[in-house]
């Protein structure tokens, strides 16, 4: 866990495979009452989500927050667009970086920090298929090395 990071509720492992993460930014999320209850219960999916900047504001799109079971009529649309809380300086910096070709903003993880839901947004550039295969190959090699070291140290 990074410094100051709280309880991790959801991670986007697919984003680490599909993108080169250039930099990360922590942002707050504007949620309704029933949404925060679902988030605290870890009923959130980041897989297809992304962030975009419109009219000087940052928005989180396609992130699924399951309806709260006891929410009844107060449940919001699970796929609705949610506003991200960033400083103006951070938004302009990200907007300037997004002008580069192939750059996008992807949510990497959602966690609680001091009782507030935060999302770690990554400024990312898409990988080619051969880059993805290389990542998988490297991960498998590291796993095999750890397994062999564990077996070797058990003697």
From Swiss-Prot:
Keyword annotations for this protein, in alphabetical order, are: Cytoplasm, RNA-binding
The principal location of this protein is: cytoplasm
Q: Which GO terms describe its cellular component?
A: cytosol
One matching Pfam family is SmpB
An example molecular function term from Gene Ontology annotations:
RNA binding
Q: GO annotations under biological process?
A: trans-translation
Where in or outside the cell is it found? Cytoplasm
Carries keyword RNA-binding?
Answer: yes
Name the job this protein performs.
Required for rescue of stalled ribosomes mediated by trans-translation. Binds to transfer-messenger RNA (tmRNA), required for stable association of tmRNA with ribosomes. tmRNA and SmpB together mimic tRNA shape, replacing the anticodon stem-loop with SmpB. tmRNA is encoded by the ssrA gene; the 2 termini fold to resemble tRNA(Ala) and it encodes a 'tag peptide', a short internal open reading frame. During trans-translation Ala-aminoacylated tmRNA acts like a tRNA, entering the A-site of stalled ribosomes, displacing the stalled mRNA.
Q: Which NCBIfam families match?
A: PRK05422.1 (NF003843), smpB (TIGR00086)
- Record-stated family: Belongs to the SmpB family.
What protein name is recorded for this chain?
Answer: SsrA-binding protein
Q: What is the lineage of its organism?
A: Bacteria, Bacillati, Bacillota, Bacilli, Lactobacillales
